């Protein structure tokens, strides 16, 4: 049952990519910086970390806006080497670091973990999950990497590439249940949660 006057909807993020994704659902919403502590806990694995951070971001904003539904999200890229050892890849921040990250991704599989939590009234969680997307990079030479970074400058993206842009040309394959997850917000399962909360979609 859809609500005639649904409560406010807030995206607990300052990411323009997540904002653009949520705009696809054509719902009225606002954005707030979550201000949550993102320090990893000792021994915390990547999947547990992104789930906790998504929940913490949503809860931090919900504490300030108790009547609103709040969406929190977090993403991490994890590189798998030939022995199966995991290493995390953050947002490169600089051109040199971006080039180094893509060099380390060449010919390898990168797992993107995208967590979502939808909460209301100071942490009363309605819905939370972690989407897993596997990206297999083709073998990349130095010139290809440098051209890509110069053209797209994906310095604020986990893993140092944008699948929605030229980054798709670096891929050999992408295995995902939700193509929007890799960009930063899995809309298929998020829209299901929002429908459960009473938002009219479509």
Predicted regions and their residues:
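A short beta-strand-loop structural module common to alpha/beta enzyme folds
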Residues: 30-38
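Residue-level detector of anion-binding/catalytic polar loops
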Residues: 28-30, 200
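Cofactor-binding loop segments of dinucleotide-utilizing enzymes, especially the Rossmann-like FAD-
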Residues: 14, 34, 121
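Short loop/helix-cap segments at secondary-structure boundaries that form the rim of catalytic
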Residues: 20-24, 41, 63-64
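N-terminal beta1-alpha1 ligand-phosphate binding loop
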Residues: 2-27
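Anionic-ligand binding patches
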Residues: 3-9, 43-202
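A generic short alpha-helical patch detector that favors 3-5-residue windows
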Residues: 27-28, 162
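Flexible, glycine-rich phosphate/dinucleotide-binding loops
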Residues: 18, 38-40, 125
